[in-house]
C-alpha cells in the first residue's frame, strides 16, 4: 500500500523527504558532544598503581550528552594519560575538533614503567568516523588544555617543564606559536582556563602552589607576574560564564586529610582568593554548570587507597555546590565510581557525567537543583581519565 501510494502520488515525495530529513536532523540540533580520554596503561589494584603489560591503545570515547540517556557515538584510538588533571581534553566551541594530551607513555626502555610524553592529538569530530588528523609535540608532560572563547587559540599546560604552550587555530589546523615559562621547571602548570572575554587566563601550578594570571592579546600570551596562593597543590579550575568567579581544587598532601576547594573573585583587579571550603580527600575535577549557578566537584574520597588504609572508602563522590556571588553552599552529593576523575554538565544543567577510573565507566547523574542521583553508566575501553564538553 505504501509503495502504491508513493507511485500514484509522486507529488508527495518531496514532502515526505523533507519530513524524514527533519526527523533525522532533530537529534543533531540537540546534540552536545562530550569526549572522554581513556588510559589503558595504568590500573589501580588495591591502592597501588600498576603498569599494564602489553596494554591496548589508549582511546577517546565520543558521547552525545544531549541524548536521553547519553549515548556513545564512537571511539578513536589516541594517546592519553591519567597523570594530570581531568581537563586533558578540550573541544572547540563549534564542536568540530577535540584535543587530547598525553602526559605519560610506556617507557620504550622498560615497558614496566612510564615516562614523560609530549603529545597533543587533534580529533576531527565531523569526520565519519571521527579520526585523529594531527599529532603535535608541545612541552614536557602536557596536562591541561583549553580553547580560547573564540576558538582561535589553544593553551596547553606542561607539568614536566614548567611551561605553557601556545597554539594558533585556523579551522581544524593547529600551529605551535610559542611557549612561556611560569616559574622554574618544577612549578607544575596543571590546568589553564580562559576568562569569557578571552583577554586573560588562569593557570594552576601544583608544583609551587600558585595560580598565575596570563594576559592574552591574539596569539600574544604573557605572564603578568600576578599570582595567587590558595591551598596545597592547586589543580583543576573552572571559570563562570559571566567571568565573575572561579573555583579550583587543591589536592593537598595526599595523606588522607580533608582537602579544599577555593573561590576566586575575578571582579577584583588583580583577582583575589575570597573563600575556601573543606570537601574531603583529594578533590580532582571542578566544572561550572553552563549557567554558572552551580559547580560540580569530583572527590576521590580515599577510593584509590588500599582497602586496609584508615582513609579508604569504596566509592568516590560528586558534590554540587550552589554559587551565590562568591559564596558556595552544598546543594547535593552522590556516590560514584572510585578513583574519580572528571565531571561535565549537559547544556540544560540536568545531567552530569562523572568518570570512575576503578570501574572503567562513566556514571550518568540527574540533578534537579535539590537531588543528585546516579541514573545509569557508560562503559568505556580503559580508565576514563579526562573529559570535557565545548565551553561556549
Spell out what each predicted region is.
Residues 13-25:
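Bacterial N-terminal signal peptides
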Residues 1-11:
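N-terminal secretory signal peptides that target proteins for export/translocation
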Residues 4, 27-392:
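Predominantly soluble domains enriched in secretory-pathway, periplasmic, or organellar proteins
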Amino acid at each position: 500500500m505504501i509503495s502504491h501510494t508513493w507511485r500514484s502520488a509522486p507529488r508527495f515525495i518531496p514532502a515526505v523527504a523533507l519530513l524524514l530529513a527533519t526527523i533525522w536532523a532533530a537529534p543533531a540540533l540537540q546534540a552536545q558532544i562530550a569526549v572522554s580520554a581513556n588510559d589503558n596503561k595504568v590500573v589501580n589494584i588495591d591502592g597501588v598503581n600498576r603498569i599494564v603489560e602489553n596494554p591496548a591503545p589508549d582511546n577517546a570515547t565520543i558521547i552525545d550528552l544531549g541524548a536521553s540517556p547519553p549515548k556513545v557515538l564512537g571511539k578513536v584510538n589516541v594517546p592519553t594519560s591519567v597523570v594530570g588533571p581531568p581537563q586533558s581534553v578540550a573541544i572547540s566551541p563549534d564542536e568540530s575538533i577535540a584535543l587530547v594530551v598525553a602526559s605519560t607513555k610506556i617507557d620504550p626502555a622498560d615497558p614496566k614503567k612510564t615516562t614523560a610524553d609530549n603529545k597533543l592529538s587533534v580529533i576531527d569530530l565531523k569526520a565519519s568516523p571521527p579520526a585523529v588528523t594531527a599529532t603535535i609535540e608541545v612541552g614536557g608532560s602536557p596536562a591541561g588544555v583549553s580553547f580560547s572563547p573564540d576558538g582561535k587559540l589553544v593553551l596547553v599546560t606542561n607539568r614536566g617543564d614548567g611551561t605553557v604552550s601556545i597554539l594558533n587555530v585556523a579551522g581544524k589546523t593547529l600551529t605551535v606559536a610559542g611557549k612561556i615559562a611560569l616559574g622554574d621547571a618544577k612549578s607544575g602548570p596543571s590546568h589553564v582556563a580562559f576568562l569569557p572575554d578571552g583577554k586573560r587566563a588562569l593557570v594552576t601550578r601544583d608544583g609551587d602552589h600558585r595560580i598565575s594570571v596570563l594576559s592574552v592579546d591574539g596569539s600574544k600570551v604573557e605572564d603578568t607576574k600576578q599570582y595567587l596562593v590558595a591551598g596545597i597543590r592547586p589543580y583543576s579550575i573552572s571559570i563562570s560564564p559571566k567571568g565573575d568567579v572561579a573555583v579550583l581544587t587543591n589536592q593537598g598532601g595526599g595523606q588522607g586529610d580533608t582537602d579544599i576547594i577555593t573561590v576566586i573573585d575575578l571582579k577584583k583587579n588583580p583577582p583575589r582568593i575570597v573563600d575556601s571550603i573543606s570537601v574531603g580527600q583529594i578533590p580532582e575535577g571542578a566544572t561550572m554548570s553552563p549557567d554558572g549557578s552551580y559547580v560540580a566537584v569530583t572527590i576521590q574520597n580515599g577510593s584509590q587507597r588500599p582497602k586496609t588504609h584508615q582513609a579508604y572508602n569504596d566509592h568516590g563522590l560528586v558534590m554540587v555546590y550552589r554559587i551565590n556571588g562568591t559564596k558556595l553552599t552544598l546543594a547535593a552529593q552522590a556516590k560514584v565510581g572510585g578513583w574519580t576523575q572528571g565531571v561535565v554538565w549537559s547544556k540544560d544543567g540536568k545531567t552530569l557525567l562523572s568518570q570512575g577510573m576503578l570501574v572503567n565507566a562513566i556514571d550518568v547523574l540527574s540533578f534537579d537543583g535539590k537531588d543528585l542521583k546516579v541514573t545509569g553508566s557508560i562503559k568505556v575501553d580503559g580508565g576514563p581519565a579526562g573529559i570535557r564538553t565545548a565551553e561556549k
